[in-house]
């Protein structure tokens, strides 16, 4: 019965009916309500800056938002890449923006650059994981949650004029499925316009040939489709950053002063800074936020939930409930636990057998060694006994010879002492 009701409700939901209203209801104010709620809540926008030390990341951020962010000066002697986030509260008119700028400090400064991308990937995944954990809470509060997911990665390319470095290709390839990448050529005033044009073509060709997916400004919205299509053709943007003001004619402009002339930051004939600012902030900021949530975060979330045992149902079957998923995961866990216990028990038994064999082998070796030492001891004892007997025999022979010699000496002494007495007797006669 329950299954029939569920099918009936499902069919009803699949076939909505169109009705006409007899008068004004009021839900046409929903867009205004949404705008009012969004303005009250405020917005968050998180930018990841990746590029070599000294390439102008901090200067460009100051120029983009027309302010001065307090940042520590980075050293060229970092032992590893570390991510340094800084959060600022900005306000323009009545719109609040919580801006987080994450700098990849030390990127490209190490001799071994094979794993330079790893801390960046780990940081992006960590922000996804934090958001996922907040979503999975029983009592979650996403309204007040400070979303730290990276919305855009500005990848600063060194203006060599030749081609992309292998480090750039590897890093962007590792990041393109996790974040919206906008490649920019930094310090574009250091190479000529002709070299810059060739460099842009070379960069885009290398990105395409290596399968690197960069962020494309959306063309499905009629309001911005035309300008976005034009701007897509200008990628990568060649930018110049500066917070210094230089007098050009009768007005002050942000520019870089050189002995040979002035490079105006906001002059589109000099660089693409205005194009970058328009595309990044004025036109596509919300799309970058949406792409981060609906594409990159959803990919991470799907992979994580599949690892946890969740999965979508087939078209012909009923969706899996949380209880079914839990029970299936519990059975899988218990089965895995039993298998591990059996493996450990078998390993323990094998280890005991191996130990017993080793002990028996040691015992046999010790017994053989003991028997060998015993034989050696007996042999030595026999030799000592023979030596003792020989010594006793020699001692006895020596004593006999000594006694014989003493007897002979005594007889000789006695005979010698009798001769004077005989002479005295003869004289008396």
Swiss-Prot record:
GO biological process per UniProt: regulation of intracellular protein transport; regulation of protein stability; regulation of SNARE complex assembly
CDD domains: CDC_Septin
Region described as G1 motif: spans on this chain: 51-58
Keywords tagged on the record: Acetylation, Cell projection, Coiled coil, Cytoplasm, Cytoplasmic vesicle, Cytoskeleton, GTP-binding, Membrane, Nucleotide-binding, Phosphoprotein, Synapse
Biased composition range(s): Basic and acidic residues: 376-391
Alphabetized PROSITE patterns for the sequence: G_SEPTIN (PS51719)
Major location (coarse): cytoplasm
UniProt-annotated location(s): Cytoplasm; Cytoplasm, Cytoskeleton; Synapse; Cell projection, Axon
Occurrences of domain Septin-type G (ranges): 41-307
Bias (Polar residues) ranges: 409-420
GO molecular function: GTP binding
Location of region: Disordered: 376-397, 409-429
Annotated region (G3 motif), positions in chain: 103-106
Modified residues (Phosphoserine): 10
Pfam family, one: Septin
Stretch forming the signal peptide: none
Coiled coil: 322-408
SUBUNIT field: Septins polymerize into heterooligomeric protein complexes that form filaments, and can associate with cellular membranes, actin filaments and microtubules. GTPase activity is required for filament formation. Interacts with CDK14, SEPTIN4, SEPTIN5 and SEPTIN7. Interacts with VAMP2; the interaction inhibits interaction of VAMP2 with SYP. Interacts with STX1A.
Family, as annotated: Belongs to the TRAFAC class TrmE-Era-EngA-EngB-Septin-like GTPase superfamily. Septin GTPase family.
Function: Filament-forming cytoskeletal GTPase. May play a role in platelet secretion. Seems to participate in the process of SNARE complex formation in synaptic vesicles.
Protein name: Septin-8
């Amino acid at each position: 019965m329950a299954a029939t009701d569920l099918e009936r409700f499902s069919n009803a939901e699949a076939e909505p009916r169109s009705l006409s209203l007899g008068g004004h209801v009021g839900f046409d104010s929903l867009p205004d309500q949404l705008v009012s709620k969004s303005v009250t809540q405020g917005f968050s926008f998180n930018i990841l800056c990746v590029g070599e030390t000294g390439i102008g990341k901090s200067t460009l951020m100051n120029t983009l938002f027309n302010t001065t962010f307090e940042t520590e000066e980075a050293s060229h002697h970092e032992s590893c890449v570390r991510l340094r986030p800084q959060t600022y509260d900005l306000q323009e008119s009545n719109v609040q923006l919580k801006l987080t700028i994450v700098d990849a400090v030390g990127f490209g400064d190490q001799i071994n650059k094979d794993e330079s991308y790893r801390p960046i990937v780990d940081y992006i995944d960590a922000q996804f994981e934090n958001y996922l954990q907040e979503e999975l809470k029983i009592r979650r509060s996403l309204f007040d949650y400070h979303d730290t997911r990276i919305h855009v990665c500005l990848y600063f390319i060194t203006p060599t004029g030749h081609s992309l470095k292998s480090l750039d290709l590897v890093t962007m390839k590792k990041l393109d499925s996790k974040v919206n990448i906008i490649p920019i050529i930094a310090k574009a005033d250091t190479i000529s316009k002709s070299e810059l044009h060739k460099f842009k073509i070379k960069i885009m060709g290398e990105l395409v040939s290596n399968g690197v997916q960069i962020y494309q400004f959306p063309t499905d919205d009629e309001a911005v489709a035309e300008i976005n299509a034009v701007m897509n053709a200008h990628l990568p943007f060649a930018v110049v950053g500066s917070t210094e003001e230089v007098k050009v004619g009768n007005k002050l402009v942000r520019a870089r002063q050189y002995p040979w002339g002035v490079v105006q930051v906001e002059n589109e004939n000099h660089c693409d800074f205005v194009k970058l600012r328009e595309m990044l902030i004025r036109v596509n900021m919300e799309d970058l936020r949406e792409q981060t949530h609906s594409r990159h975060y959803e990919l991470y979330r799907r992979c994580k939930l599949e690892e946890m045992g969740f999965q979508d149902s087939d078209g012909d079957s009923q969706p899996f409930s949380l209880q079914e998923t839990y029970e299936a995961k519990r059975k899988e866990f218990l089965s895995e636990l039993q298998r591990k216990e059996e493996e450990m028990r078998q390993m323990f038994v094998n280890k005991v057998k191996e130990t017993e064999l080793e002990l028996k082998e040691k015992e046999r070796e010790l017994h053989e060694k003991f028997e060998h030492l015993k034989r050696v001891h007996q042999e030595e004892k026999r030799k000592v006994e023979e030596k003792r007997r020989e010594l006793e025999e020699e001692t006895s022979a020596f004593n006999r010879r000594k006694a014989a010699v003493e007897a002979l000496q005594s007889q000789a002494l006695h005979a010698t002492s009798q001769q004077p007495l005989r002479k005295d007797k003869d004289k008396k006669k």
